[in-house]
């Protein structure tokens, strides 16, 4: 079921246990977290963090647009503020309202949400695990950024669709190499990291892919 806790939409399993992982799902609304939960094997509380403008709210710094799209505004610092408030309030609310103790805190995101999740883990140390699912790690300047910043997590899940690097857009096409570079960087930092290839393009099976990442974190953190 999905319940409202102080304005936050949170999925709680019907047979919730006394201790559950808390998954913060960047860019997902109620239907998104319900879809992810439906594909998961592990039980977890999942909180929705919907956004109105992915190109603005999930990007860490400005960048030019893709083709004829909107420029990337680089306003992810506002998402950090939301995450700060959430992490200061939600574990206490889950305990007082639902009788649930948070066992671990996980951050997941798809596409630009995956980019934002990894960036947030360089800015905060409150997440035990991070999943960048079909993450937009091609993003201008991210290779250089991640090379010079520590990722504050015990485990990181990375994935891409196998068709994602095969695109005519040169910026998007570097996503495979960029994700491999992030994987190498994280393993050298002794962070438990996995990089999975899924069949299909960037848009295929998004909730199922996110669920795979969430399950892996639940089992490996």
Give the ranges of each region predicted by the language model:
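Serine-hydrolase catalytic machinery in alpha/beta-hydrolase-like enzymes
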Residues: 9-11, 16-97
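Loop/turn elements at helix/coil->beta-strand transitions in domains of secreted/extracellular proteins
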Residues: 18-22, 42-45, 126-129, 153-154, ...
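The conserved beta1-alpha1 loop
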Residues: 24-27, 134, 160
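Short helix-loop-beta connector
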Residues: 100-103
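Gly/Ala-rich beta-loop-alpha elbow adjacent to hydrolase catalytic centers
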Residues: 108-113, 117
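Short, hydrophobic alpha-helix immediately C-terminal to the catalytic nucleophile
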Residues: 118-122
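A conserved short beta-strand
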Residues: 126-138
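The feature captures the conserved acid-bearing segment of alpha/beta-hydrolase catalytic domains
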Residues: 136-218
């Amino acid at each position: 079921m999905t319940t409202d806790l102080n304005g936050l939409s949170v999925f709680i399993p019907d047979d919730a246990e006394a201790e559950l992982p808390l998954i913060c799902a960047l860019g997902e609304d109620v239907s998104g977290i319900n879809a992810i939960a439906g594909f998961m094997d592990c039980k977890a509380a999942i909180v929705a963090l919907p956004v109105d403008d992915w190109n603005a709210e999930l990007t860490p710094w400005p960048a030019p647009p893709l083709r004829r799209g909107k420029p990337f505004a680089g306003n992810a610092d506002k998402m950090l503020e939301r995450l700060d408030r959430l992490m200061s309030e939600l574990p206490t609310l889950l305990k007082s309202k639902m009788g649930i103790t948070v066992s671990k805190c996980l951050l997941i995101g798809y596409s630009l949400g995956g980019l934002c999740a990894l960036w947030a883990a360089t800015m905060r140390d409150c997440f035990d695990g991070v999943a960048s699912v079909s993450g937009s790690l091609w993003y201008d300047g991210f290779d250089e950024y991640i090379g010079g910043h520590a990722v504050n997590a015990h485990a990181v899940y990375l994935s891409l669709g196998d068709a994602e690097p095969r695109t005519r857009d040169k910026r998007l096409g570097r996503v495979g190499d960029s994700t491999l570079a992030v994987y190498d960087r994280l393993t050298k930092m002794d962070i438990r990291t996995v990089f999975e290839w899924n069949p299909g393009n960037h848009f295929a099976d998004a909730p199922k892919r996110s669920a795979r990442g969430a399950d892996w974190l639940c089992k490996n953190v």
